[in-house]
Amino acid sequence: MITKVDRNAVRKKRHARIRKKIFGTAERPRLSVFRSNKHIYAQIIDDTKSSTIVSASTLDKEFGLDSTNNIEAAKKVGELVAKRALEKGIKKVVFDRGGYLYHGRVKALADAAREAGLEF
């Protein structure tokens, strides 16, 4: 019997390989992205303390768009997370794409965060 490939399991394996190489510090924390079918989430994490410094998602009250699962929503989340990071004094981050391909919503979030002032 032919088994179907579980795309999320493959993504999790890919993310584990990426996480072996990427580590966020207090000087340069990790910008982690999680994407679901309906929403997109971004966190800036200090891995030395295992704590989230800043987060933003399409579930936030400040979000303000009707649709939450498209490229425009991802751009808005990228701008929000960058604005909140700059308020906390964070300018440089390490981008963690979460095992997702750098395309579509993930790329839109990253580009919007760069345009808003984050460096990676």
From Swiss-Prot:
Ribonucleoprotein found in the keyword field: yes
InterPro entries listed in its UniProt record: Ribosomal_uL18_bac-type, Ribosomal_uL18_bac/euk
Classification via CDD domains: Ribosomal_L18_L5e (cd00432)
GO cellular component, one term: cytosolic large ribosomal subunit
Any one GO molecular-function label of the UniProt entry: 5S rRNA binding
Keyword annotations from UniProtKB, A to Z: Ribonucleoprotein, Ribosomal protein, RNA-binding, rRNA-binding
Protease recorded as keyword: no
Domain of life: Bacteria
Stored Pfam families: Ribosomal_L18p (PF00861)
UniProt record, GO biological process: translation
Function comment: This is one of the proteins that bind and probably mediate the attachment of the 5S RNA into the large ribosomal subunit, where it forms part of the central protuberance.
Family of this protein: Belongs to the universal ribosomal protein uL18 family.
The protein's assembly and partners: Part of the 50S ribosomal subunit; part of the 5S rRNA/L5/L18/L25 subcomplex. Contacts the 5S and 23S rRNAs.
Name listed for the protein in its UniProt record: Large ribosomal subunit protein uL18
Record organism: Geobacillus kaustophilus (strain HTA426)
Name of encoding gene: rplR
